[in-house]
């Protein structure tokens, strides 16, 4: 897939800006707080319907405006599509595909897929379980759009159950029973999908980590569900029964802490290098190699599942990589993946990145083309991405 254009109206600090993407790699150059990351955030919204920065739509609407309108033109193997998201200061968002209003915004998922890599992604290694769950969930939403619906349902049941647990002194335990069953049913659906995604991702990530580390390091990614699958299987009914039993066993603790302690909202991933937990022992260089390996694995997995390459969004991260890791990334993506890159300066880049990129300067929500060393037609670009 190839993102041909993006039109932002009253989105963040963009009043009315159109950008045409004319090369497989686009570098967004500018000082901090000028709008580079905001542009990547717009692409992220089309990919996942979420922002990793804020949870409320009104925080994305430009100050003084009632709504923001984002329009993307995307080339897919099946043809060109126009996607639109309208965000409101008040009220629900509105999404369209090719002029048709979608009754469920989740139906837009899968139209434009992307993998984002920023300096914040180092939290995958050194941060808490929530960061690792969020990363896995963003991947799954693009691989299986139904996953977003499961998450919504699970979140609703979890909130209802926690609201009851907060009334521990006067709680009628019979009210928990139907919510326990729903939590187990939906929770197992989520854990099964997470488990299967990790099984497919592990060999890809391990391969890239060996390559980047010069065959010196072995990466192991292990899924740690809140409730272990019975007998090393993911058979749904048996897994649900085990989760219900664990909920019953933790009842006193849940009443004491007034929150749900069992379910996929307590899952984690264990990342280890050569048998040692990366969170505790990995150097900064090893952490960067690990996260880069995960991101390259994401790209490959999405391409394998969808049959088309996703976009790669690099948010001020290349400066965090030494030239060797930059070269590994450059060789891995070549022209297969359309790449949008933000940076404050070009000096830390491998020169081959600069020579083959479209360069746009970003200043206070305005974009200006600096150089387009290669200016092939859209058709030839799409052909190069598919070759």
Swiss-Prot record:
This is DNA replication and repair protein RecF. Belongs to the RecF family. The keyword RNA-binding does not apply. SUPFAM superfamilies: P-loop containing nucleoside triphosphate hydrolases (SSF52540). ATP binds at residues 30-37. One of its GO terms (cellular component) is cytoplasm. It is found in: Cytoplasm. The RecF protein is involved in DNA metabolism; it is required for DNA replication and normal SOS inducibility. RecF binds preferentially to single-stranded, linear DNA. It also seems to bind ATP.
């Amino acid at each position: 897939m190839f993102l041909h254009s993006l039109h932002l109206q009253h989105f963040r600090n963009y009043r009315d800006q159109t950008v045409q993407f004319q090369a497989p790699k686009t570098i967004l150059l500018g000082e901090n707080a000028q709008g580079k990351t905001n542009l990547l955030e717009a692409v992220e919204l089309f990919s996942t319907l979420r922002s990793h920065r804020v949870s409320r739509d009104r925080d994305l609407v430009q100050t003084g405006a009632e709504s923001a309108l984002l329009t993307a033109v995307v080339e897919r193997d099946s043809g060109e599509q126009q996607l639109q998201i309208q965000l409101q200061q008040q009220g629900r968002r509105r999404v369209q595909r090719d002029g048709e209003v979608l009754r469920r915004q989740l139906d837009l998922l899968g139209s434009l897929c992307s993998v984002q890599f920023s300096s914040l992604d180092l939290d995958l290694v050194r941060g808490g379980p929530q960061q690792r769950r969020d990363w896995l969930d963003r991947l799954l939403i693009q691989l299986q759009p139904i996953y977003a619906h499961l998450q919504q349902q699970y979140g609703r049941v979890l909130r209802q159950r926690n609201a009851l647990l907060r009334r521990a002194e006067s709680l009628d335990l019979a009210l928990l029973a139907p919510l326990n069953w729903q939590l187990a049913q939906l929770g197992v659906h989520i854990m099964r999908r997470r488990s299967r995604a990790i099984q497919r991702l592990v060999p890809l990530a391990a391969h890239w980590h060996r390559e980047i580390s010069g065959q010196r390091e072995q990466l192991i990614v292990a899924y740690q569900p809140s409730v272990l699958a019975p007998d090393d299987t993911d058979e749904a009914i048996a897994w649900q029964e085990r989760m219900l039993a664990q909920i019953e066993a933790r009842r006193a603790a849940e009443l004491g802490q007034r929150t749900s302690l069992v379910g996929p909202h307590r899952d984690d991933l264990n990342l280890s290098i050569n048998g040692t937990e990366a969170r505790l022992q990995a150097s900064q260089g090893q952490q960067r190699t690990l996260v880069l390996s995960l991101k390259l694995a994401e790209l490959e997995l999405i391409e394998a599942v969808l049959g088309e390459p996703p976009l790669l969004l690099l948010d001020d991260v290349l400066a965090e990589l030494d030239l060797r890791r930059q070269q590994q990334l450059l060789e891995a993506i070549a022209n297969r993946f359309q790449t949008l890159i933000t940076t404050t300066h070009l000096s830390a880049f491998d020169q081959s990145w600069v020579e083959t990129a479209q360069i746009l300067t970003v200043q206070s929500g305005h974009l200006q083309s600096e150089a387009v060393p290669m200016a092939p037609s859209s058709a030839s670009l799409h052909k190069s991405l598919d070759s």
